[in-house]
């Protein structure tokens, strides 16, 4: 499979971001609103990245660069809450890995 490490990283990031957003929503805290928004955006961008890469789209590289930006922003926001919430810590770690894989692809 083409860029299988990047696709696996995007899939893991999609799942971690969805889980983090869901857990943050359950906390009902205004402090987490940006985290929720970035996690949801990052998950969608990761999903798009996977789809475009699998069909060898001419836009795949552009979306991978957007994925790097989105994962980096999401990781930075999740890290603000990482000391108190495992789902935020895990999401930040997975986002950093995904950004690295997309950058390398």
Locations of regions flagged by a protein language model:
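Amphipathic alpha-helical hairpins
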Residues: 1-105
């Amino acid at each position: 499979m083409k860029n299988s490490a990047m696709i696996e990283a995007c899939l893991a990031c999609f799942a971690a971001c969805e889980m983090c957003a869901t857990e943050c929503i359950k906390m009902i805290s205004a402090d987490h609103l940006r985290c929720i928004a970035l996690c949801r955006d990052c998950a969608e961008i990761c999903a798009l990245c996977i789809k475009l890469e699998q069909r060898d789209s001419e836009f795949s590289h552009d979306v991978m660069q957007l994925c790097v930006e989105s994962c980096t922003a999401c990781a930075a926001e999740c890290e603000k809450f990482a000391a108190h919430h495992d789902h935020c810590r895990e999401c930040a770690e997975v986002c950093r890995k995904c950004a690295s894989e997309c950058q390398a692809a």
